[in-house]
Amino acid sequence: MSARLQDHFNNVEKILNGFSVECYVAYGEINISIKDQRDIHLVLKKLKKEYHFKQLTDITAVDYLTYGQSDWQVGKVVSQTGFSRGRQQGFKTADVNNRFEIIYQLLSMANNVRVRVKCKLKDAQIIMVDSVEDLWPSANWAEREVYDMFGIYFNNHPDLRRVLTDYGFVGHPLRKDFPQTGYVEMRYDENLGKVVYEPVEIDDRVNAPRVIRNQ
């Protein structure tokens, strides 16, 4: 890494001394992996206060339910072999304590450096972390989006409602066990004069296969 990035890395590592974290550099950016999700708010607060990470650019999450699984195992470039259409396969059960990871992207304009803060969430049944809306007001909508898409709850959020999906929507679309076709379909009923919801009649099919290529 460059001398400049090394200096920032050393400073960030020093600031977080005492927390159970792992700091490393990947793809030219500093990454911080928090071991205990109860430390998320404290770590982020310290980064903002002591290294001027005053801008939260994004919050997202990853669902590792199907990590390492594929629809086809291939040893060649896909374009050389092609795929047959197939039905969506069922999912295997993931490690309940490592299914979800939450990710924060921070920017310090004063130091001209970015960090990526990540934390594996320990309970996939009731997923709850502390809100950082009190640190960055922009977290309000970002946390609502993560809740809407992944079903992760945020303690002390002032208005934790869905922000992208429709009223009465069931499920969380970016979870790996959410069907690509959804659960219901919507159409306008001319006889009733209103929009109605009906169970989806389309079978799940593999249109964009998940592939692990053996190099």
Swiss-Prot record:
**Catalyzed chemical reaction(s):** a quinone + NADH + 5 H(+)(in) = a quinol + NAD(+) + 4 H(+)(out)
> Is-annotated flag, keyword Transport?
yes
Major enzyme class: translocase
UniProt KW keywords: Cell inner membrane, Cell membrane, Membrane, NAD, Quinone, Translocase, Transport, Ubiquinone
UniProt keyword Membrane present: yes
Write down the Gene3D superfamilies for this protein, in alphabetical order: NADH:ubiquinone oxidoreductase, 30kDa subunit
**What membrane topology is annotated for this entry?**
Peripheral membrane protein
* UniProt-annotated location(s): Cell inner membrane
Record-level Gene Ontology MF annotations: NADH dehydrogenase (ubiquinone) activity; NADH:ubiquinone reductase (non-electrogenic) activity; quinone binding
Q: Per the record, what is one GO cellular component? A: plasma membrane
Please state the Enzyme Commission number of this protein.
7.1.1.-
Could you tell me which Pfam families the record lists for this protein? Complex1_30kDa
Provide the disulphide bond pattern. none
Cited InterPro entries:
NADH_DH_suC, NADH_quin_OxRdtase_su_C/D-like, NADH_UbQ_OxRdtase_30kDa_su, NADH_UbQ_OxRdtase_CS
Q: What is its main location?
A: membrane
As given in the record, the signal peptide range reads none
Q: Which family does it belong to?
A: Belongs to the complex I 30 kDa subunit family.
The annotated subunit structure for this chain is:
NDH-1 is composed of 14 different subunits. Subunits NuoB, C, D, E, F, and G constitute the peripheral sector of the complex.
Q: What does this protein do?
A: NDH-1 shuttles electrons from NADH, via FMN and iron-sulfur (Fe-S) centers, to quinones in the respiratory chain. The immediate electron acceptor for the enzyme in this species is believed to be ubiquinone. Couples the redox reaction to proton translocation (for every two electrons transferred, four hydrogen ions are translocated across the cytoplasmic membrane), and thus conserves the redox energy in a proton gradient.
Q: What is this protein called?
A: NADH-quinone oxidoreductase subunit C
Source species of the chain: Francisella philomiragia subsp. philomiragia (strain ATCC 25017 / CCUG 19701 / FSC 153 / O#319-036)
Task: Print the organism lineage.
Answer: Bacteria, Pseudomonadati, Pseudomonadota, Gammaproteobacteria, Thiotrichales
What is this protein's gene name? nuoC
